[in-house]
Amino acid sequence: MPTATKSRPAPPASRTKNNNGPKSNAPPQAQVAFGKITAGVGHRIVTFGPGGVGKTSLSATAPGPVAFFDLDDSLSVLGNQLDGLDIRLVTGIDSWSDLRAALHSPGWDAVKTIVIDSATQAEELAIAYTLKTVPHEKGNKIERIEDYGYGKGYVHVYEVFLTLLADLDQHVRAGRHVILVCHDCVSNVPNPSGDDWIRYEPRLQSPASGKSSIRLRVREWADHLLFLGYDITVKDGKASGCGSRTIYPNELPHCMAKSRTLDEPLELEYRSAELWEKLFGTNSK
């Protein structure tokens, strides 16, 4: 009788990866990148204070050559106070487009500091540009910021002004210092833990809602927000001063301020380079 043949089990499927199969189209997973801390970039500085305190004169003594956007027509009044300073007046600035075009033009290689005097006036140019170029969503005629509707005009101006800060950031990354000179205003400070109070702040757009506040955005943008004020004393409701002036680099009840490097107030003296030496080093010139 014939012997039955035993069937053998089939060999297990190979566990070797088949490289001939379809490949995944998924992009490679991104990895975090690390770099060195950038040295040699410029400082973003904002100064503000009452009229005549010396904002323009101080800016003119910054490390030169100083390129000056004299939107307030201040330099011609200062006259011989500017003797010996390396100031290069940027001309032909009559509109917001002129201001931005100049910042994007070639020829900045030798400049160490850019001054816009004032950012308050630059904001006026931004408003005029907004009214001219941003239409009403329903096609209505626009003559004032309020004509856009509740709060919308402030949003438009805010977005326009941000383009200037971006332009200036390019110069900061190239190693140039930027100084925005602002006029001042008195603003109410809400205090959740007690009574509100008033203080000096830069005169820039800042709606009560806090939204679209150019003032608060500029404070965030700046490395140094410096208040320049006269030294006064008040007794029995009467104020008196001695003519001395102080640069405040830190927030106090009477002024908005900040600095990434300065800790103490400085006396503001005529054509003194002390501020720039403390900010940029003794060889800042």
Show which residues each predicted segment covers:
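Conserved GTP-binding G-domain of TRAFAC-class P-loop NTPases and closely related GTPase folds
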Residues: S187-K285
